[in-house]
Amino acid sequence: ENIYETEEFLTKKGIESSSAKMVKKGTLLIAMYGATAGVLAVSHIDAAINQAILALIPNIDINLFYLKSTIANQIDVAVHRLVQGGQPNFNASIINAFELRLPTLPEQKAIADVLSAADEEISLLQKGLEEEKLKKKSLMQLLLTGLVRVNE
């Protein structure tokens, strides 16, 4: 996920009178609980977040997509441990306990590029699958209402 715009906005007064925090573009965001727990996104804009979002701001030089992919992998593993008949909840302690392998920046970029290409391929396949599902739904409508007949 990438965030390039928001649907809602806060005024400066709104930020000051709430628990919202401002984050700068390039921040890795993690949903901490609820239906979106564990979902990661990179903010490509300065934005306000609430207490349900954890902002990760690296203090080292790291490829952001590599970091996102590494954290996503760790979250997938953690979700299996956290789910006990309900939705998983994360907190900063759980995320801070993740151990990250940090190869050189060129290797991080190479890994990130491969994973990004895989993500793009998956997105295209998912889009194609959705299109096929719509075609099937249309065909079902035509066949089941008798608008189109099947020859025996």
Segments the model singles out, each with a brief description of its role:
Residues 1-25:
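Sequence-specific dsDNA recognition surfaces
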Residues 30-31, 117:
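A generic structural signal for residues embedded in beta-strands
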Residues 32, 70, 142:
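Conserved catalytic core of Hanks-type protein kinase domains
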